[in-house]
Amino acid sequence: KFGDIIRQPLPVATFTFLVIVIIAFVRAWVTQRFAGEIPAVSAPLGYYTAAFRLSWPLLSAAASIVMLFVAGFLIGRSSVRAELYATRCFLAMPLFGVVSCGVLLSSDFLTQSLTLLLLALASRNYYNSFHRHYCFDRMFRGSLYVGLIPLLYAPGAGLLLLIPLVVLLFRRTLREAVVALSGAILPLFFAGFIH
């Protein structure tokens, strides 16, 4: 049964995911050691996570691994709940590990891991809100997470354009669209107020 990659139990999928993440961090360390650091794109809140990473490198690496693990677990659990596969499997968890560790290109892995965690949380909240009528709190939280992403990681600004598309595709009401828009804009107001 060990050769069947689709039907691996949760502990095996979790172990595979953690091995992929550790290999990605070793690859990033070797690449940075010999080729130099690839600078990250600057963002208002990304500056603080980059400063934390420089001050506490081991703690930020551990926090990054934990954030990637939580995001992978959320993605794996969501794929089981949404019945994406014909059989109950946790294949999405190692696949998320491969994709997410391919994204970790710059030296600012803490910011990118936090961005992936926010994206997984936003996806989970959107998924839960679209299966219920008038679920304003989850719509707001999902949009709030998406609104935080460009403040942490500037290339994530394109995700803000997906909110109106998602609201239209899932035929949400105008009230839910206003809640989603206010959730996405609220972090920008706070960042503008602080800076």
Q: Predicted segment positions?
A:
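N-terminal membrane topogenic signal
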Residues: 1-18, 85
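Transmembrane-helix signature of polytopic, membrane-embedded enzymes
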Residues: 79-99, 117
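Transmembrane-helix motifs of polytopic, lipid-linked glycan transferases
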Residues: 66-82
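Membrane-lumen/periplasm interface segments of specific transmembrane helices
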Residues: 23, 179-195
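Membrane-interface alpha helices of multi-pass inner-membrane proteins
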Residues: 138-152
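Membrane-interface transmembrane helices that cradle and orient dolichyl/undecaprenyl
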Residues: 122-137
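Aromatic- and kink-enriched transmembrane "portal" helix at the membrane-lumen/periplasm boundary
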Residues: 57, 93-113
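Perimembrane helix-loop-helix junctions
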Residues: 159-185
